[in-house]
From Swiss-Prot:
A motif (VQ) lies at residues 51-60. Pfam families: VQ (PF05678). This is VQ motif-containing protein 17. Signal peptide: none annotated. Keywords: Nucleus. The lineage of its organism: Eukaryota, Viridiplantae, Streptophyta, Embryophyta, Tracheophyta. The gene is VQ17. GO terms for cellular component: nucleus. It is found in: Nucleus.
Length: 172
């Protein structure tokens, strides 16, 4: 009984730990939850005449500098020269917006167009409907427990390594 009495007295004599005057209790913020729908790339086949319209619909950008002026409505254009002009515009768009065009079908009057986004560049408005996809992919490294499996045989051909989208590495 004496032992119990001494321990109680020791506990009472210990000073209580007080908070500093300027300290505050912090509330933990809720984690940011994002639901992002990622669609697989599609190959869109179109003729050269409709290519500009399809690209504008996909990117959400309007054509401001190619509207026909009122005094040009009566003028007829040579369709062959217009086709070569469209051909140059398609290749310029290919370089600036990350579109990949198959040249085999291009000569037949059909254009096959795919979008291959570069990791370092912005999507250029192409993925506006998907939200902040660029930021989402960059933030994947913050989640080390995503359900990705890494098989060395598959990983050498894949761009998905260690829970982050990256360039392929060779395993020794």
């Amino acid at each position: 009984m004496e032992i119990e009495a001494t321990t109680v007295q020791k506990r009472r004599s210990l000073p209580t730990i007080a908070m500093h005057k300027q300290s505050r209790t912090l509330t933990k913020s809720k984690p940011k939850i994002r639901i992002i729908h990622i669609f697989a790339p599609e190959i869109i086949k179109t003729d050269v005449a409709n290519f500009r319209e399809i690209v504008q619909n996909l990117t959400g950008k309007q054509d401001h500098h190619h509207h026909d002026l009122p005094h040009q409505k009566g003028l007829k254009r040579n369709p062959r020269s217009r086709r070569s002009h469209d051909h140059h515009e398609v290749h310029d768009m290919n370089k600036s917006h990350g579109f990949c065009i198959n040249s085999d079908e291009e000569e037949e009057g059909m254009v096959s167009m795919t979008w291959n986004g570069n990791g370092d560049e912005s999507s250029g408005g192409f993925l506006n409907g998907l939200g902040d996809l660029d930021g989402f992919i960059q933030e994947l490294g913050e989640f080390p427990y995503l359900p990705f499996t890494i098989d060395p045989a598959v990983a050498s051909s894949s761009h998905l390594h260690g829970n982050v989208f990256a360039e392929p590495h060779h395993y020794a």
